[in-house]
């Protein structure tokens, strides 16, 4: 059976994005600001699109309040505090925890509660370009995830068609950060596809 590819984070969707995704061979995409019009256009071209909600909580209580609002969407959390991170990593309503330059440093306490998949977005990686400490922390999470066989999804985080990357290129991003020679194809196929196909009712 042919491998299915998914980009689990786009910030918007238009005709250019749809053309790029289909052209690169994606079968699924997850979009933060999604209109029904473009979702239908994508469907007609064989691309399944799912809505994404991204929460940026500063505390555990803020995250828990936000999670009451979810309804048949993919839920990603970009935690802005250690407390919010610890909650996001173990709450089963969270589909992915987005890694970013300001995330709390990984330690044994975080490893003890870490159950959910993490998401490495190229857009977040680019933002870390001038933040050496943040980049090191992000790389440490990627390596711990691979080491402990925690699911990792790599996404583009694209806001336009020009920022969408081929799935193999996304897979090489994770490989480069974790010193692996081969692209980590599961990060753009099995892991995000499993997340996006799950029953959300």
Positions of PLM-derived features:
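Short beta-strand elements of ligand-binding domains
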Residues: 76-79
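Charged catalytic cores and adjacent phosphate/nucleic-acid-binding surfaces used
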Residues: 1-31, 36-52, 57-65, 70, ...
């Amino acid at each position: 059976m042919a491998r299915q590819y998914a980009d689990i984070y786009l910030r918007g969707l238009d005709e250019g994005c749809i053309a790029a995704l289909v052209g690169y061979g994606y079968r699924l995409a997850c979009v933060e600001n999604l209109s029904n019009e473009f979702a239908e256009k994508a469907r007609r071209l064989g691309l399944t699109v799912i809505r994404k909600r991204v929460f940026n909580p500063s505390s555990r209580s803020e995250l828990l309040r936000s999670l009451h609002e979810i309804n048949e969407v993919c839920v990603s959390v970009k935690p802005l505090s250690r407390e919010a991170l610890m909650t996001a990593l173990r709450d089963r309503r969270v589909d992915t925890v987005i890694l970013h330059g300001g995330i709390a440093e990984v330690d044994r306490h975080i490893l003890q509660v870490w159950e959910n998949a993490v998401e490495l977005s190229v857009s977040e990686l680019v933002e870390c370009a001038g933040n050496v400490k943040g980049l090191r922390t992000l790389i440490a999470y990627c390596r711990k995830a691979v080491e402990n066989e925690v699911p990792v999804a790599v996404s583009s985080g694209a806001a336009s068609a020009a920022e969408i990357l081929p799935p193999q290129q996304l897979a090489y991003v994770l490989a480069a950060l974790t010193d692996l020679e081969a692209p980590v194809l599961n990060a753009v196929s099995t892991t995000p596809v499993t997340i996006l196909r799950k029953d959300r009712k």
